[in-house]
């Protein structure tokens, strides 16, 4: 699996994730504005955090 791993609006970068079957994109807001985090897997998130998990290479941009 290959997933994007750049933060928020940074230029796209990817990471190879051996053994993973998901990529994720988490989104939340704080005093800095909207924060976006991308990576491998499908982590559980706390209330107020939106997450989108997907199962194809580079699907989480």
UniProtKB/Swiss-Prot annotation:
One of its GO terms (molecular function) is toxin activity. SUPFAM superfamilies: Snake toxin-like. InterPro entries: Snake_3FTx, Snake_toxin-like_sf, Snake_toxin_con_site, Toxin_cobra-type. Expressed by the venom gland. The keyword Transmembrane does not apply. Residues 1-20 are annotated as: Disordered. Gene3D superfamilies: CD59. Keywords: Acetylcholine receptor inhibiting toxin, Disulfide bond, Ion channel impairing toxin, Neurotoxin, Postsynaptic neurotoxin, Secreted, Toxin. It is found in: Secreted. Belongs to the three-finger toxin family. Short-chain subfamily. Type I alpha-neurotoxin sub-subfamily. This is Short neurotoxin 1.
């Amino acid at each position: 699996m290959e997933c994007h791993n750049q933060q928020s609006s940074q230029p796209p970068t990817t990471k190879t994730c051996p053994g993973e079957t998901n990529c994720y994109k988490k989104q939340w807001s704080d005093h800095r504005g909207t924060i976006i985090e991308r990576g491998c897997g499908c982590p559980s998130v706390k209330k107020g955090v939106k997450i989108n998990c997907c199962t194809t290479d580079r699907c989480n941009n």
